[in-house]
């Protein structure tokens, strides 16, 4: 699996900023690009934990309904990069332990996806990892309401995701955009989480089937 992803042993904070600029240049709307470049994007990192046993599946969390931001949404473990974190990998691993109790020694980082930029002003480094098996978790009740697992086989089935359209205004500019939705059981995975999962899908599709 590690050969499929960007290798991130040397992703310093400076390299993260450079990768963000590379991602920004992919925007086709010049006004949107200009607006994003002027705004202060908050550096963040998430862990995409792939649990190998008994079948490959991705750990996801549901945020508590009482939260002020992103209440009830589905997300990966992760958060803002702390000034004491040496790199985005450190952030992703630290946040994962704090949120769901997975220990550092159980996590094997195998690479990263492209930087993901959100409409709410975050630049996210998705760190891909594999975990052989996990028998117990310790959830932070203030950050995580529950966890569940999305089988990779489900993600790779084209029938299990689709696009929706929406629009919003920021600084007087209207943005029209499409976003992915991945319905799974009683969960609706959308927004940045679904976007990063679809980036993972693009890499894995045809490689492990």
Q: Which residues are covered by each model-predicted region?
A:
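NUDIX/MutT-family hydrolases
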Residues: 139-176, 183-185
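Short, glycine/charged-enriched secondary-structure capping and boundary segments
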Residues: 74-75, 124, 142, 163
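N-terminal leader/linker segments that precede catalytic domains of diphosphate-processing enzymes
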Residues: 1-73, 80-98, 102-112, 116-134, ...
């Amino acid at each position: 699996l590690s050969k499929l992803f960007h290798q991130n042993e040397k992703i310093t904070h400076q390299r993260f900023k450079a990768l963000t600029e590379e991602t920004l240049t992919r925007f086709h709307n010049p006004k949107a690009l200009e607006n994003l470049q002027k705004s202060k994007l908050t550096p963040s990192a998430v862990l995409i934990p792939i649990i190998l046993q008994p079948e490959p599946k991705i750990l996801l969390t549901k945020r508590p309904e009482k939260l002020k931001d992103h209440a009830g949404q589905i997300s990966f473990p992760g958060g803002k990069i702390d000034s004491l974190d040496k790199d985005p990998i450190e952030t992703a691993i630290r946040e994962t332990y704090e949120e769901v109790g997975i220990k550092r020694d159980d996590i094997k980082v195998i690479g990263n996806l492209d930087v993901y930029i959100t409409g709410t002003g975050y630049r996210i480094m998705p760190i891909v990892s594999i975990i052989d098996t996990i028998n117990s978790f310790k959830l932070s009740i203030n950050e995580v309401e529950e966890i569940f697992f999305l089988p990779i086989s489900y993600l790779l089935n084209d029938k299990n995701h689709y696009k929706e359209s929406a629009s919003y205004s920021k600084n007087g500019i209207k943005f029209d955009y499409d976003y992915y939705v991945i319905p799974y059981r009683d969960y609706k995975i959308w927004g940045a989480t679904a976007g990063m999962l679809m980036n993972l899908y693009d890499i894995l599709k045809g490689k492990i089937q």
